[in-house]
Amino acid sequence: MTESPTAGPGGVPRADDADSDVPRYRYTAELAARLERTWQENWARLGTFNVPNPVGSLAPPDGAAVPDDKLFVQDMFPYPSGEGLHVGHPLGYIATDVYARYFRMVGRNVLHALGFDAFGLPAEQYAVQTGTHPRTRTEANVVNFRRQLGRLGFGHDSRRSFSTTDVDFYRWTQWIFLQIYNAWFDTTANKARPISELVAEFESGARCLDGGRDWAKLTAGERADVIDEYRLVYRADSLVNWCPGLGTVLANEEVTADGRSDRGNFPVFRKRLRQWMMRITAYADRLLDDLDVLDWPEQVKTMQRNWIGRSTGAVALFSARAASDDGFEVDIEVFTTRPDTLFGATYLVLAPEHDLVDELVAASWPAGVNPLWTYGGGTPGEAIAAYRRAIAAKSDLERQESREKTGVFLGSYAINPANGEPVPIFIADYVLAGYGTGAIMAVPGHDQRDWDFARAFGLPIVEVIAGGNISESAYTGDGILVNSDYLNGMSVPAAKRAIVDRLESAGRGRARIEFKLRDWLFARQRYWGEPFPIVYDSDGRPHALDEAALPVELPDVPDYSPVLFDPDDADSEPSPPLAKATEWVHVDLDLGDGLKPYSRDTNVMPQWAGSSWYELRYTDPHNSERFCAKENEAYWMGPRPAEHGPDDPGGVDLYVGGAEHAVLHLLYSRFWHKVLYDLGHVSSREPYRRLVNQGYIQAYAYTDARGSYVPAEQVIERGDRFVYPGPDGEVEVFQEFGKIGKSLKNSVSPDEICDAYGADTLRVYEMSMGPLEASRPWATKDVVGAYRFLQRVWRLVVDEHTGETRVADGVELDIDTLRALHRTIVGVSEDFAALRNNTATAKLIEYTNHLTKKHRDAVPRAAVEPLVQMLAPLAPHIAEELWLRLGNTTSLAHGPFPKADAAYLVDETVEYPVQVNGKVRGRVVVAADTDEETLKAAVLTDEKVQAFLAGATPRKVIVVAGRLVNLVI
């Protein structure tokens, strides 16, 4: 039996109502707070939302089988910031709770839980500023978030909650890292395989080494070097985004379009550092192709497709002479999607960071060099050094979109493989090292950027596709090949095939598919993150720790601040905070060849590590033997082709969160999941079967003449002006619309709304504001509408003056109420299942208004009980309370949800608007099953229609069944 704070006339009334005109038993904020607190305690005490697993500690104690009809609902978990929640944060959480509660009521076994993404830079920055340890601050923030979220009455299985900073959680993050580290991608099988199988192939001779080397004759170090080249996790001297102001490197996705850090807005520079990388590029095809089987917003799929960026083309080799004394020949590998234009390539451009640049730089300028090509340098080397310094702070986007074309001639030439002609080699910032090969063949006649560059530097422009006027601009359309030797007269597709065949036969090129996607930079020079399960020997060679050595716990250190540099110091070098923990760093270990000294890796994993697999831990959060039992993953996430079709990849049934994670978390988690799938650890090919992106709640903010924000709640609207009552009198302020935030002084805490109206009111208001996917403006003044709706529902059941239940038993419903009820049941059921909570709310309000008008005294139980049931997913606390007061003894959390009777979904009569020459002139009501001839007769004999016709006979009578009748005269 559940307990109620208000049941019966003896329930506790509002404490401040003794001398008030407010009825003693009205639904008020104070009453809402009491019943919400009580029902939340009841749910927690009874384990109402605890959901069973097939096996393990959360399996049914009696060994009973779990229901087959399961549903896994997941939110993108929050980062527990120090500012706490504002009213925009719960939008998606409320929506998924309504969804989960509805399906729980109709009998499905629903898993819904919420954890915290607690590692990362913000906590570390705050700790450095305040002197508070990141763990202390993070744990306090989690407590506050749990309190705030708890007030909203979410039906989460609290046993499954965790933080990514929990040692029991990040132990398995480290374990998954080791699985990826100890795997390689077999391009023949198109999947990851254990490194042990690669070693076995080398040992047996099934796989040969490059250069004909004998595996058996390699030293242990040489074998390790070979294997490291195959691993899915590897170290490389990579071109990285170095942010001196943060003291760490950043992934491409963490750098803004204007070349600054998305956290802190510091300058970011490109430089080479030895870093851990994950070979996500091996999965580019699968990541791209499997988007087709996902039920995701097309916008997100398009963003991932563009980020992966598959291009079909060819590689051509341009030979050149190195500038060293021996002048050895090097091949410059160029990727192009237009091999048909190779005869029009009149110069090459390398990215300034390209590996071959320094080898190809001439000692001096050739005689007669065009001054435009020299960048004002006395030698090519001086010019290139100056140019590199000038572009160091530019973002990739700036480099590609800059209208001014800049570059430097290397003083050397390459040979065009199509015609044997020498072409000058330049570097320019519009070519990126991270795309293709980092080198392009420039065809100014048919590429506008190349045309602009050629015009700026006085380079030749050759037409090889007929159809344009290349003296005015590049021609990028279709046409016939010209000035291209054996390709002349061919179409573009035919020329592509012919030139690729010629390049392949000459050993100077081949067809190839390229991707924009780059390998994932997987190391940060920070403290607050997961330590790597890696140690280094005295030679600096990395060694993975055994799984038995996990977890590698993050040490508590007195100095956890990163070494920060002048934000503009591009030449600075990272120094991780963990390097200061010398006792932790230096360890003696036996890794199979005796006790030896090792040093731990002092980098930490990026913030995305924990979120790359956390959905799996929800399925089995207490398992100490595996990250999750296979049976539990298969039950909650395994493919269900009978339900979702033959191509079902499996995964979480519904995942809700922001679209801003499209090419970060969502791409990384897909990569990790696919590796785990390949290695046999999971049965699902994808982590998230269905994705929904919620919109944002936005609000007005106000700035004074200096651009400083003022508290939005104190701003007064006067006509078309806004004023702020400052300490020196009123000042005019200016309105802007956008994000909610503490710094914008327009933040509203959910605590404020819960205190003023109750949590159910907040839930109803946020769900009624519009479609889930759409952004919407917050208006505190409008919250009262949801509050009054719940008060009307309360009055249908409870007498506000006596506290008695006021429903009428044994009263049959009239036909209008029956139709209204069953239409509402159908509509609300469909809306809840489709996440259309705004229209579900509107239908519930409409039905409530019908009952309020129809039944001034007692409402029939048969009419109001279904309303309470339908309200339960949306406003669960008041629904539970009313359900109890209606005489029920069990919680509504597991149903029942009312079912519609189809007999009441059909109208007995239909009203037809009658148009005369397209304008409505009357209306007739006929039986729903009236045939067309009878309908026409009823229209023509209607008094209003006859009066308008004034004796005229219509030339034509047009009937649109169920909608209208049109008379043409």
Swiss-Prot record:
Catalytic activity, EC: 6.1.1.4
Question: Which PROSITE patterns does the entry link to?
Answer: AA_TRNA_LIGASE_I
Its GO CC terms? Answer: cytosol; peptidoglycan-based cell wall; plasma membrane
The family database entries (Pfam families) matched by this protein are listed as: Anticodon_1, tRNA-synt_1_2, tRNA-synt_1g
Tell me where on the tree of life, at the top rank, the source sits.
Bacteria
User: What keywords are annotated for this sequence in UniProt?
Assistant: Acetylation, Aminoacyl-tRNA synthetase, ATP-binding, Cytoplasm, Ligase, Nucleotide-binding, Protein biosynthesis
Please give the name of this protein.
Leucine--tRNA ligase
